[in-house]
Design a protein with these regions (language model features):
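Single conserved hydrophobic/aromatic residue that forms the stacking wall/gate
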Residues: 1-6, 10
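Charged helix-capping and loop-helix junction motifs
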Residues: 77-86
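C-terminal functional extensions of proteins
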Residues: 100-142
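Active-site rim loops that border cofactor/substrate pockets in soluble metabolic enzymes
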Residues: 11-76
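A short helix->loop->beta-strand "cap" motif at the edges of active sites that frequently abuts
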Residues: 11, 90-94
């Protein structure tokens, strides 16, 4: 039953309708574009979290977050990750966050205690969530 429900979740892809583009990562100016207007030469540095995305997160029972959705270290490109962090913090879901950049974003935008579980491990965190046995855990007898 669980794998059937999980399969249904994986079939659904929610994409942003607007993205933030700029000439370079060091640019102080940016432009918001509809996703359909993005050209091959545009450099996307952030996305706008849609109300649909926020609603799905707010109604989720579990949220797994791995990786920021924009270049959150730079002012014009941090809005998407900031919105994501605030939405997760405001959710009643059990939330898991993994990866050094994700934890840095959490520390920048919200209180770490607003996330149920944080791990600085990125790839290892995801592998563990997949049920893979990690060498370090195995060495400890786990």
């Amino acid at each position: 039953e669980c794998s059937s429900a999980a399969s249904d979740v994986y079939k659904r892809q929610i994409l942003p309708n607007k993205v933030i583009v700029a000439d370079s990562i060091d640019s102080n100016s940016s432009t918001t574009k509809n996703i359909d207007s993005v050209s091959g030469s545009d450099k996307i540095f952030d996305i706008n979290l849609t109300s649909n995305m926020s609603e799905i997160l707010k109604n989720s029972k579990t949220i797994l977050w791995n990786g920021p959705i924009g270049v959150f270290e730079k002012e014009p490109f941090q809005k998407g990750t900031h919105q994501l962090a605030k939405t997760i913090a405001g959710s009643e879901a059990f939330s898991l966050a993994g990866g050094g950049e994700t934890i840095a974003a959490i520390n920048k935008f919200i209180n770490k205690d607003e996330v149920s579980y944080c791990s600085t491990g990125g790839g290892a965190f995801l592998e563990y969530m997949e049920g893979k046995l990690l060498p370090s855990i195995e060495a400890l007898g786990g």
